[in-house]
Every structure is written in structure tokens, then in C-alpha cells.
Amino acid sequence: MTPMRPHLPDPKQAEGPYRPFTSDPGWPEAWWWLGFPLLVAVFSIGASQIAPDWYRSYALPEGYGIIEVVHFVIPLLGLLIAARLLFLPFVRARPMVFAVAAIGAVSCLYIAGEEMSWGQHFFHWNTPEYWALVNRQDETNLHNTYAIFEKTPRSLLEIGIFIGGLVIPLAAPFAPWLRAFRMSLFLPPAALVPTALGAVLFKLIDRLHQGGYSTLVMRPSETIETYLYFFILAYLIVFARRIKELEAAEGAPQK
């Protein structure tokens, strides 16, 4: 009996054997998956140390600072990718794949909307008095009201990034099946390790900052958010590429 030819990890394919994706980013693409995390660290630390007044005046301000604009643009790009996936027949035929794309789209929409207070930072409308009573920054957003709208989803995201962005990629060389089983489509690639590592390191810096220790960067929580949002965007980029690879394989003649 001729052994079955390994196919790509497709949640719709209940039986293996499976083979790893070949579209995941490698070293030729390090300019973005490694370059951006390094750029964020160099910019945050360098500007805080060399030009603290400039960093405070132009990078950190709510609504129009460089970092705030980046925090709006990154999830907006993620929203475009995730929303496009929702209309693909391949995705709609796979409930789990559709669910992940939908969660990605909703998450990116929420983040982008919240970062700009759903347009308040663009159009400068006044916050209704009843909403100002519950919003600690007098803005028309949810994340400055109750913990369930900010701390809870952020904690879940941080845990997910630690496990998916560090634990799984570092374990994969010792457990190759992680890249070649039915659900491998959903696991972050090794290319996301630098972003996850940046989020963890600046989280430690933020804890020191909260403890009253002098740190290398002002408001490290803003840098953490940059890493968190970029992780989502990078994950969606790879997720879309893997789906494209699956689509191509599905349309290829079987040998």
C-alpha cells in the first residue's frame, strides 16, 4: 500500500500525515519581523534618553503623538487583512478559521477605535457629561472606564503572546509535530519571537517603573502596546499567507 502524501495542516482535513507550511517568514524577510521590533526598542529607549523633551512632546501625547498614531494605523491594517479573509469561500467553509479571522477583525476594530476614542481625537467633540462621570480621562472610549474593557483583554492577549510567541516557537524545534498537525494553521510562527520577546522585556521594565525604579524609557506601557498590536498584525499577515498556501494546495492536482 502506497503511503499517503503529507498535506498542509488544514482543520478540515481530519487525517494526516501533515507537513509544515512553507510560506512562513524566514531570514530574507527579517527586515520586518525582526527590524520592526528592534526599531521600536531603539526608538523608545534612544528618544527617551537622548531627547526626553521631544519624546514627551511629540511621541507620547494622546490622540496626535507619534506612538498614538502608530497604535491606530497598526490595528487598522490588521482589520483590513482580517476583514478580507472573512469573505473568502475557503475561510467561510471552515468554522474555526472563520472564527479566528472574525476575532482578529473585531479585535483590530476595537483597538483602532479605542485608540482614537472612536473619532473624538479627529473631530474633537465634547464628551457627554454622563459618560465623563465613568471615564477617567473624559473621553468617548471604553478602555478608560472599567477593567473588563482594558485590563482583562490585555492580560489575555499578553498570556497568549507569551505562550504562542515564545513557548510554542521555542518548543517547536524539539517537538516538530507542532508545525505539522491539524491545528498548526493557528500557531504563531517563529518569526514572531522578537515581537513577543520585546513585549515581555518591556513588561518587566514597566513593572520596575511602577515600583519607583528609574528606567530607560518613559511610559514603557506605550511601548508594550506597540509590541502587542504589531504581534496581532504580524499574526494576521502570516495567517493570511498560510490560508493562501492552503488554497493553492487545494486547487493543485492530487498525485
Can you annotate each of these PLM segments?
Residues 2-28, 91-92, 174-187, 245-255:
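Membrane-interfacial, low-structure loops and terminal tails that flank and connect transmembrane helices
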Residues 32, 37, 189-255:
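Alpha-helical transmembrane segments of multi-pass integral membrane proteins
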Residues 47-58, 173-176, 203-215:
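Juxtamembrane "helix-exit" motif on the non-cytosolic side of transmembrane helices
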Residues 90-109, 177-192:
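Interfacial segments of alpha-helical transmembrane regions
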Residues 109-129:
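Transmembrane alpha-helix/helix-exit interface in multi-pass inner-membrane proteins
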